[in-house]
Regions:
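Nucleotidyltransferase catalytic core that binds NTPs
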Residues: 1-162
């Protein structure tokens, strides 16, 4: 839903549509963490490439993690992207210790000349659709439901051992 809204705004306003996501792998590598992911960067790029003009994955390094919420708004949203619209989910957080949130984005919208659009979480049977929910249904063996929640075919990549 969020990507669709970004694409629609780009088309309507004759602007480049950009999705910015955070590539957590550099930080996880530093911390020695190997989380279960539904999709890694390359898969995300493949999935989104026809939907928007640009997918930018910011490497989430320790120095990026230390960036204040105010600096994130000024340096990333304003100076780097020159954003006219900022489209986020209701629980979007950013900046050091997740101090930035939707409320802060709204407070700075006039100062940095962007319009904030907040997308509500999608639900299925009164439950918020999340990566955790999708992982649960996959573990339960319900790939059909996983595909319904994702909105695209669920894929698994790996090596088959005999």
């Amino acid at each position: 839903m969020l990507v669709k809204k970004v694409r629609e705004l780009g088309e309507q306003e004759k602007l480049n549509s950009i999705v910015c996501s955070f590539d957590m792998r550099p930080l996880w590598k530093e911390m020695g963490i190997t989380p279960e992911l539904l999709m890694v960067g390359e898969e995300r790029q493949e999935r989104v490439k026809d939907e928007v003009d640009y997918l930018i994955e910011c490497p989430f390094t320790e120095s990026f993690r230390q960036k204040s919420a105010e600096d994130f708004i000024q340096e990333i949203i304003h100076d780097l992207f020159h954003a006219k619209y900022v489209v986020v989910g209701t629980d979007f957080t950013f900046g050091c210790e997740k101090r930035g949130d939707v409320r802060m984005l709204a407070e700075y919208a006039d100062q940095y000349d962007y319009q904030l659009i907040v997308i509500e979480k999608e639900r299925y049977r009164d439950r918020i659709i999340s990566s955790t929910y999708v992982k649960e249904v996959v573990k339960d063996g319900d790939v059909g439901l996983a595909e319904k929640l994702l909105g695209y075919p669920f894929e698994v990549e790996g090596t088959v051992e005999h």
